[in-house]
Every structure is written in C-alpha cells, then in structure tokens.
Amino acid sequence: KRPAGYSATDDRLTAEVLKRLNGNHLEKFPGDADLAARIASYELAGKMQITVPEMMDLTNEPDSIHKQYGTDTGSDLKKEYAKNCILARRLLEKGVRVVQLFNGSDPSGGNGITNWDSHSNIKNTHAMQAEIMDQPTAALIADLKQRGMLDDTLVVWATEFGRMPFLQGNGTGRDHNPDAFTCFLAGAGVKKGHSYGTSDNFGAKAEKDPTSVYDFNATILHLMGLDHERLTYYHNGLERRLTNVHGHVIQDVLA
C-alpha cells in the first residue's frame, strides 16, 4: 500500500531515478552478471508493486463470479480459498505461466484439525476440508472453460499421499497411504471424463495400471511441451532428470 501523501507520480519518478542510478552503476561493472540479475529482480519487484494491488482487488468481479466460487458462503477458510481461486484465474489472464494453490495446508500437529492429515477425527475433518475445496475448485475449472482458457491451461489437482483403508490408534483417524490415492488432470491435452488405474478392493494398493510420481511428472511436462528425458539439472556431479530414469508419459490420459 502506498504511504499517505505519496502519489503515483512520486512513485513513478522515484523508480525512474533509481533505474538511472542502477544503470550508471552497472556501466562500471559491465561483466557482472550477478549485479545485472539483482537489478533486474528489483525492477520486476517494482513493476509488481504497481500492478499487483489492482489485480488482487476482487471487488470489481461481478456478483455472479463471487456466487459461483462461493466467496460469500461457508467458513472463513472456504471464503479465503475461493478468493484464491479467483485470483489464480486473474493471474493466468495476466500471463502468469504457473500458479500454485494450496488447500488444507494449515499446520495441525498431526490431528487434522485444519488440514487433511487426519490421524484422528477423519470423518469431521475431511467433511470440513471437502466443503472448503469442492465448490471453488469446480468453479475455477468451469470459469476457465467459459472464458476459453481451459484449452491451453493444464489444471493439476494433486496430493502427496492418501489415507489407509483402516482406522488407526483411537479408531477415529487413518494413517498415510502412499500406495493408493487419486490425482486428476483437466484442461489442455487431457481426455475428458477418463479414469486411469484402479486400486484393490480395499483401497490399500494400486492394482491395475499403477502410476509412479515420475510417470505423473513426465505426463505433466509432456503436456507443457517439455521432453522429460532431455530436461536435466546438474546435481551432485550428475545431470539428473525430474522423472528419474524410469518415468514414462501416461499416453492413455492424453487427448
């Protein structure tokens, strides 16, 4: 927020003076890439200070959008998540290429009070989290579609693990299950209404077409136009892939 008595013109003139000073300093060290990168990052931060406040102001969204996302109903946690979903769409409209949203990320000490980590009280906790997430998430996808943005936007809904099919401890919660859980993809390049893979009858382990996180990442990278076998990063003396050596694109989910 701009301080009282400090106008937009003052802000612009200050930025112009700073840019000239930085440019003069950079001319003295023409080969200093770190200095150039730091100046560029400050300039980007300055541009964000000018454009971000307007973009984050959701009061100019029509009532129909607020109703669609549910910013005015339910718990405060749901309202905030719904606002973040609208903000995600606005960021995409401005050309931001990657937007990440979190749901149920509040710490709980393992009791699942404000997140999905329900080692106890799973019935009430998951009901609360589902109420927070369902309407805004569905509204975001529908909104992207109605604006013609879903054709070139990939929506990835993912988690790190699921829950065991049996109760634990005091009988009201369930432990982590890394062997069977659900993620979904929507939008650009993905089949509509298609499911891939199944678990056993208990929901304990993936049984048909098990998918690793490397396969999942390879598929996402493919949909983003990146070859996961050629995209490498130097780490500990080796060129490493994000998909390790055994990740494969899941062809069956591609449109």
Indicate residue ranges for each PLM-predicted region:
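Ligand-binding pockets and gating/stacking loops
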Residues: 1-255
